[in-house]
Amino acid sequence: DSLETEFRLRRATYLSISGYIHDALNEINDIDTTGFSQGLRSTYYAATRQMYSYISFYYEGHERHFDKWHNMAVDAQKHLLPTLPKGSDAYMLNLGENYYYCREYARSAEVLTELIARIEPQNPDYAIACHILASIAGSRGDINARIYYLALSAISDLRNATLEVTSIQELGGLLYERGDLDRAHNYLNVAIDNVVQSRASVRMSQTTELLNIVESHHNRQMAQWRRLLYVIIVFLFICLIALVAAIWYLKRQLRQVA
């Protein structure tokens, strides 16, 4: 029964990120939580927190609906924390994230900095912690720190072959804002490939919209470079003709002098 319940919880999470919100909610609501063991209760709250968080992303720009699902995710996380062993990696990650959601940025940064100092970049928690630290840096206006932590998070995602990611997408957007179109274009292409492979429709519209903007600017930049290259080629061709003409003229003058 516990294996079946775990499967249904994970299925609900996957359904939510794939856009099947009603199916995900029905799956969760059909699960009988009475008699759950401590471990299964922890899995339940972790799954519902993740599911509500994914659902909230669909309502970005619609404050009332976003706040509803976001608050449900935060509430599920508060229920999750007491079920986790204190001091464990999962506990510290969720504690730091909860501090962040409650806008206690200093406490969140303290917990998460301690966490990434003791775990390896190959640990999936490392990427999540670094992404939150990047968001904290962004709230403080520290762009360099934000880029640094987004890069660490993206590298960790790549090492773990994690396809459902946000760090490389955000990093691409940030580099675009700073005028680094080539790297922004490359990173967003990787991000869209990951989105397609993971079937994470919640990320699809965000990444596609950003990629279209960068693609447009990138194409314009490439067109400018091509025009400049044509101008240089024409200029060099004219210089070559002038050089040939000058050599011919000098030879003619030398023959006349001789």
What does each model-identified segment do?
Residues 218-258:
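Alpha-helical transmembrane signal-anchor helices
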Residues 1-223:
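A "functional boundary" signal
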